[in-house]
Curated annotation (Swiss-Prot):
Positions annotated to bind ATP: 109-115
Subcellular location: Cytoplasm
Listed InterPro entries: Mur-like_cat_sf (IPR036565), Mur_ligase_C (IPR004101), Mur_ligase_C_dom_sf (IPR036615), Mur_ligase_cen (IPR013221), Mur_ligase_N (IPR000713), MurCDEF_pg_biosynth (IPR050061), UDP-N-AcMur_Ala_ligase_MurC (IPR005758)
An annotated GO cellular component: cytoplasm
Listed name of the protein: UDP-N-acetylmuramate--L-alanine ligase
Function summary: Cell wall formation.
Keywords, sorted A to Z: ATP-binding, Cell cycle, Cell division, Cell shape, Cell wall biogenesis/degradation, Cytoplasm, Ligase, Nucleotide-binding, Peptidoglycan synthesis
Amino acid sequence: MRGHYHFIGIGGIGMSGLARILLQQNLSVSGSDIAFNYTIEGLIKSGATIYKGHSPSYITSGSTVIYSSDIKTDNPEYLAAKNLQCSLLHRAELLALLTRQKKSLAVTGTHGKTTTSSLLATTLLEANCDSSFAVGGIIPQFQSNAKHGLGDLFVFEADESDRSFLKYFPYGAIVTNIDNDHLNSYENSEDVLIQSFQQFTSQISSPNHLFWCGDDTHLKFLNGIGQSYGFGEHCNWRISNVFQKDFNLEFDLEGNEKKYPSIKLNLIGRHNLLNGAAVFGLAMSLNISEASIRHTFERFCGVLRRCEYKGEFENTIFLDDYAHHPTEIQTTLEGIRKAIKSKRLIAVFQPHRFSRIKDCLGMYGKIFNNADEVFVTDVYGAGETPIEGISQQQIIQEISENSSVPVKYVPRTALGHKLSEFIQPLDVIVTLGAGDVTKVASETLSLLENGKRF
């Protein structure tokens, strides 16, 4: 690969990772975004030229211009690239080009991609594979979401949300699950969604390195292909004897005609037991030593915005999680509840996108049952046009009608003040959502530390 690459919307987690990989290959990179963040600052330090806002003047003839599904076709830089007859590549097309140079290991599925791919990437790097990776979150151990390695393996997230995962032809893969999310990309049809996953798995060149969740009935089309993992007796890799103490898991795994007792994983929740089993099995199939895998699992620090510890004040703990789909919220709260036992758990939820709320109505009623209090704030639209009759109010009503957990609306601008007045010593607060609710913990802690006491 050579030439100059320009990223429209370079600050996004997927785009910034690809830009970082190109920079590490000593390629010329520029980009633009409407706002600067710490990710962009890191890219600038690595040699990228980045502009604030969008302008056709940022596009130069002969550049390869990268865009994502979030970039509209009337974007001035997109239009300028077309007018200058620049090579235009969707983010997934660039990732496909990069992964073709290696033995690529894709992680796909509706939920769990980022944690699973990050754990897999960390496991391989800790085993001195010098693998490449491009994941959807920042791995604290590397302070990065991407790396260009000299080894022959490349771990990456294959995003199903916009159907772009069909552009990949990986060497091996993990399929975590299939759930009814992003159906607007699949003609609003679950059948089309499942058929797309069937097509993706048919594109894997080494099915011996395909691992899929055997507990997910949507994945039954994979019976007899690759290796399944889960809790069921029918799974090739079976989880048993689970024990969770605080924010750590311990479990047994049986697979490959062998038992692997007392695996320790520095994560919480049933979903992460499944993620861990998938990574353990795939790593073993790649001849990574059991001792190395165990060592990594014990030391793995998770991913930013995945049940991330944000701080505490007088024994009140603040956590933050990216969960915004009902299934993700429920599993996250279940894991936290097991970790904190009887402590009061306050869930602060920021609904994400009007279209997702509409698609998921009927699923919110009981997902907060492991919380003691629920605050629901304004919808984070993520650029979507509001849908008439769809707002946070429908979610609040659904919870009120189906659960005994107290739920109330709090405007986004008032969340910090409300929490600083409401919380008590030993409470655990978790913010949930893919938007700016991630800032609420620091906002609240700042108020508390500056004299706003219990």
